[in-house]
């Protein structure tokens, strides 16, 4: 019986499914073949990935050159395992931790965005400050330090941090003279969760950036930039000084969180 493999490409700001069927390939290359699937994946990225021109400017990525180079590794008789390996290598040329190729053969991941940089973070030092009587609420770990400064460690925005969790934490820390929000080594998660936490540090609506959407197949087909605002929470808000600790291993929704927090006058970012 003929085995069918499904390859799924997950990308930043887009979710694409590339299935090994003829409906997922260019019209001029028919059939469920290695060449057809290679051409299909290359074209999907060429037309829908957001950062090709940006990455050409930053590190010289030439997507047409990538096609020429990887096409030489495709042959009609290659196994599905070898095809998956070649396609994975091609996707990794993007150097994007948000873009992975997934199939029943496994999942390819670009890890250098995380592994190639120093941690600048010590669990033992953190444990020394947290001691043993720290509090954990959802995805937040917090403590009042000896100098009456609140310390909050947010390891991930993947956990569902609710408004009740934040109310509880801020009530506990309200006696503090200031607070440290530590998001070092936070790989990201839910942007909504990150915004929910940031909303506790502003009393007014604040412009935090702009966003454009991919609108067509051209590398520069984007909508006009639209402003992005952070709204204040309707519940308890922090009114004193705050410091955000970040490092090179803070990514994705965490980057959005840090960028938002740096717009607030009572917040200082370090890292």
How does the language model describe each region?
Residues 179, 251, 264-271:
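Short, well-structured beta-strand/strand-turn elements
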Residues 146, 237-239, 264:
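Short, well-ordered coil/turn elements that cap or connect secondary structure elements
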Residues 1-31:
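Bacterial Sec-dependent N-terminal signal peptides
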Residues 233-236, 240-249:
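A conserved mid-domain beta-alpha-beta active-site/ligand-binding segment of alpha/beta enzyme cores
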Residues 23-213, 218-227, 241:
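Flexible, low-complexity junctional segments that flank or bridge functional domains
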């Amino acid at each position: 019986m003929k085995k069918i493999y499904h390859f799924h490409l997950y990308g930043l700001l887009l979710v694409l499914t590339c299935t090994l069927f003829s409906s997922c390939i260019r019209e001029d290359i028919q059939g469920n073949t290695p060449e057809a699937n290679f051409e299909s994946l290359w074209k999907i990225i060429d037309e829908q990935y957001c950062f090709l021109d940006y990455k050409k400017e930053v590190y010289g990525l030439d997507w047409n050159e990538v096609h020429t180079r990887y096409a030489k590794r495709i042959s009609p008789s290659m196994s599905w395992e070898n095809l998956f390996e070649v396609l994975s290598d091609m996707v990794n040329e993007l150097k994007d931790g948000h873009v992975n190729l997934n199939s029943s053969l496994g999942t390819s991941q670009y890890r250098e965005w995380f592994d190639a940089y120093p941690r600048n973070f010590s669990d033992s030092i953190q444990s020394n400050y947290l001691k043993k009587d720290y509090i954990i609420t959802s995805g937040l770990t917090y403590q009042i330090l000896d100098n009456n400064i609140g310390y909050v460690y947010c390891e991930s925005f993947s956990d569902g941090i609710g408004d009740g969790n934040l109310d509880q934490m801020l009530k506990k820390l309200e006696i503090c003279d200031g607070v440290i929000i530590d998001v070092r080594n936070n790989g990201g998660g839910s942007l909504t969760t990150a915004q929910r936490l940031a909303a506790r540090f502003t009393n007014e609506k604040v412009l935090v950036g702009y966003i454009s959407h991919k609108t067509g197949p051209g590398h520069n087909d984007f909508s006009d930039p639209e402003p992005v605002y952070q709204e204040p929470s309707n519940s308890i808000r922090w009114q004193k000084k705050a410091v955000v600790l970040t490092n090179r291993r803070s990514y994705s929704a965490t980057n959005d969180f840090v960028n938002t927090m740096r717009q607030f006058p009572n917040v200082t970012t370090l890292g």
